[in-house]
Structures are given as structure tokens and as C-alpha cells.
């Protein structure tokens, strides 16, 4: 029997202070000052475990009393993505979503409800094993992969 672990809907774990420190150090190492909007976006990303759109990150910043423009959020996301500090996730609805790229390579995949639009993270060790088995079979080196399963969540079924 296969074990799949998924976060309950709307339940997020923080990305960890390790990622936040790593992101700030990477910005400093390449000469970017980590002020204002960059600090706010990094803090918002560090407080999530699953992907969020620029608009959702902007709303999260505003909800915690931070003030920055949406254009600054987009610029910061572009910078962080260019430094491989965040992963861009395409869930198929035309909205780019972002999440921390953990320095240790830890990652998860996504379940997307086509009815309500909810996105839920899941991890399945058997799936990871199968991906690497296929790669070995066809003599291919996998550097990264994204799995997005689309369908209907428990609430919408």
C-alpha cells in the first residue's frame, strides 16, 4: 500500500527560518540590498509552505501591516526566481505561483481543484522513486520536476 501525505486544505506550514536566512544571504552575496519590499516578500514566502501568486503574496503583506506596491512584489519575485531561491509553479490556470526552493532540495507536488481553484501540497515517496526509475531506464539525468494533478477536491466532489 502506497502512502501519500497531503496537507489538509487551507493548512500551511511555514517554509522555515532556514530558507529565509538562505534567501537573505544569497541576496547579500550577489550585492542586492535586502530592504523594504524584498524583506516583506521574503518574509511572506517564508511564512508559507505551498505556492502563492504575486497577488496573494501582496495581500499577505498587507494583512500583516506591510506596505509595498504590487510592481515591487513582481520585481522581487523575478529577482528571487533568477537566483533560484523560489520555484515558479504553473497550475494550468494562467496564474504564476511561487514557493520557496529549499536549499536541501526538499519539494512537494500539487493537487489543483478545477472547480474552486484550491491548491494543496502533497508528497509521495513512491512517486519520487518512480520518477528516478524512469530516468535511469532511459538514461536521463533529472535536474528538476513538477507534478500538478488536476481534478476535484473533497469539498467540490
Enumerate the language-model features and the residues they cover.
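Non-DNA-binding regulatory cores of transcription-related proteins
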Residues: 82-157
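Short, leucine-enriched amphipathic alpha-helices that occur as contiguous helical runs
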Residues: 20, 37-38
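Short, Lys/Arg-enriched N-terminal segment that forms or immediately precedes the first helix
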Residues: 18-31
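Pre-recognition alpha-helix immediately N-terminal to the DNA-recognition helix
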Residues: 39-44
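A short acidic, leucine-rich amphipathic alpha-helix
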Residues: 56-62, 73
Amino acid at each position: 500500500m502506497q502512502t501519500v501525505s497531503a496537507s489538509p486544505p487551507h493548512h500551511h506550514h511555514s517554509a522555515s527560518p532556514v530558507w529565509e536566512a538562505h534567501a537573505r544571504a544569497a541576496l547579500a552575496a550577489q550585492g542586492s540590498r535586502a530592504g523594504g519590499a524584498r524583506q516583506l516578500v521574503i518574509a511572506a514566502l517564508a511564512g508559507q509552505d505551498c505556492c502563492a501568486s504575486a497577488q496573494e503574496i501582496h495581500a499577505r503583506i498587507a494583512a500583516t501591516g506591510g506596505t509595498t506596491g504590487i510592481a515591487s512584489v513582481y520585481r522581487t519575485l523575478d529577482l528571487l526566481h533568477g537566483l533560484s531561491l523560489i520555484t515558479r509553479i504553473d497550475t494550468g490556470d494562467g496564474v504564476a505561483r511561487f514557493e520557496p526552493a529549499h536549499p536541501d532540495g526538499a519539494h512537494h507536488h500539487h493537487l489543483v481543484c478545477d472547480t474552486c481553484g484550491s491548491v494543496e501540497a502533497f508528497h509521495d515517496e513512491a512517486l519520487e522513486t518512480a520518477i528516478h526509475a524512469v530516468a535511469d531506464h532511459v538514461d536521463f539525468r533529472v535536474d528538476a520536476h513538477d507534478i500538478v494533478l488536476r481534478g476535484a477536491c473533497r469539498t467540490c466532489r
